[in-house]
């Protein structure tokens, strides 16, 4: 699983809570980082994505391709939301870390 966000606090907190739940996750800062890791042979079971990453049209195209293959959870802003990405699940800020983790665990369960 990948946690993709430029916000270190979000990445770190979600990863820590997932680790407590027995789920390992890789924290990545950008979609470019995600592409490099996938090109290196690591495939995610699920991607949690900060919606701010979707404002860039090039990043959007890369993520549309990814979202057709793996579940994607977008954490989006209420004030400046990114356009919806087809095939993804969206949560709007403000949202608590435990709510994000609960949604991730539910998505992993339904995907298996």
Residue ranges, per PLM feature:
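Short amphipathic alpha-helix used as the core "switch/output" element in two-component signaling
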Residues: 57-69
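Conserved acidic carboxylate
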Residues: 4-6
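Output/docking surface of receiver
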Residues: 75-112
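Acidic, metal-coordinating helix/loop segments flanking the phosphotransfer/catalytic sites
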Residues: 29-46
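Short, charged/polar "capping" segments at the starts of alpha-helices
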Residues: 10-12, 36, 54-57, 80-84
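Two-component/phosphorelay signaling modules centered on CheY-like receiver
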Residues: 8-26
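Active-site residues of response regulator receiver
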Residues: 48-52
